[in-house]
Regions:
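N-terminal Rossmann NAD(P)H-binding glycine-rich loop of SDR-like oxidoreductase domains
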Residues: 8-28
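Adenosine-cofactor binding site in Rossmann-like domains, unifying the SAM/SAH pocket
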Residues: 30-51
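NAD(P)H-binding glycine-rich loop region in Rossmannoid oxidoreductase-like domains
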Residues: 46-85
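Active-site "gating" loop of Rossmann-like NAD(P)-dependent oxidoreductase/epimerase domains
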Residues: 67-70, 75, 108-128
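NAD(P)-cofactor binding segment of oxidoreductase domains
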Residues: 75-103
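Active-site helix of classical SDR
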Residues: 134
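NAD(P)-dependent short-chain dehydrogenase/reductase
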Residues: 140-187, 193-201
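Mid/C-terminal beta-alpha module of Rossmann-like enzyme folds, strongest
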Residues: 175, 198, 205-259
């Protein structure tokens, strides 16, 4: 039977985040949807996951919850591991027990960034940060359980809500005459709305088997290139009467970037 005719019982986790909010806006209205944010299910405490998930008996679990602040992850390693690895493993085990399918989101930070060409799903992983390592650990823990799963590795996610590079840059562009942005890291800026749209199309068409898939927009740029493009677009949108002080963006290497 076509999934579009079913009342798919779906548990959406991380519903208030960037990707979660995009799913909340796009999930089919005829599906039976339960949306949980951090207040309803805090993934820092994995012991609560089985009882909470079993209570709803979902057929599909979409996990959009994650610890995503790369720099902060180095200072909060236990919390990052708890959310990105331990909780994900518990979700996968619970999905297996329920016979539910788990949709999970990972990142291009599972790679070391040294490859000149675009990474494929078969490319060797080699995370350089604690954040990247926890996301890779989460991937492996899902596949190890034998549950039904789809893992999507995304890149430089942005949305109108939530914490992301665009939001941070917007504030800096308003407040400062000149800013410095890293120019030697490259990725594919990808909107949360696009991610939700493609994943839902795949679910509705039932055309993906268990596995890991790369999902991002076409092309690539640096953080510097993205900041410059954003400023140019904002300066052209005079109708919104935005006030930006910044007129100069300087490119710097990652080695000169100072974290807060």
């Amino acid at each position: 039977m076509d999934r579009r005719t079913l009342r798919m019982k779906t548990l959406l986790l991380g519903a208030t985040g960037q990707i979660g909010n995009a799913f909340a806006e796009q999930l089919p209205s005829h599906w039976d949807i339960i949306s949980l944010g951090k207040k309803e299910l805090d993934l820092r405490n994995a012991d609560n996951i089985p009882s909470t998930v079993f209570k709803f008996e979902p057929e599909l679990i979409i996990n959009c919850a994650a610890f995503t602040e790369v720099d902060l992850a180095e200072k909060k390693k236990n919390e990052c591991s708890a959310i990105n690895h331990i909780a994900v493993h518990e979700l996968a085990k619970t999905s297996k027990a329920l016979g539910a399918r788990l949709v999970h989101f990972s990142t291009d930070y599972v790679f070391d960034g040294c490859q000149a060409l675009a990474y494929s799903e078969q490319s060797p992983t080699g995370p350089l940060s604690h954040y990247g390592q926890t996301k890779l650990d989460g991937e492996n823990s899902i596949s190890d359980t034998g549950c039904e799963f789809l893992i999507f590795r995304t890149s430089w996610v942005f949305a109108k809500n939530g914490k992301n590079f665009i939001g941070k840059i917007d504030k800096l562009l308003r407040d400062r005459d000149e800013i410095s942005v890293v120019n030697d890291q490259f990725g594919a800026p990808t909107s949360a709305s696009f991610i939700a749209k493609i994943v839902l199309l795949s679910l509705l068409r039932s055309n993906l088997s268990n596995g890991i898939y790369h999902l991002s927009s076409a092309g690539a740029t640096s953080w510097l290139g993205l900041a410059q493009k954003y400023l140019a677009l904002c300066l052209n949108e005079s109708a919104e009467n935005r006030q930006y002080k910044c007129r100069k963006i300087i490119g710097i290497p990652s080695s000169e970037y100072q974290t807060a």
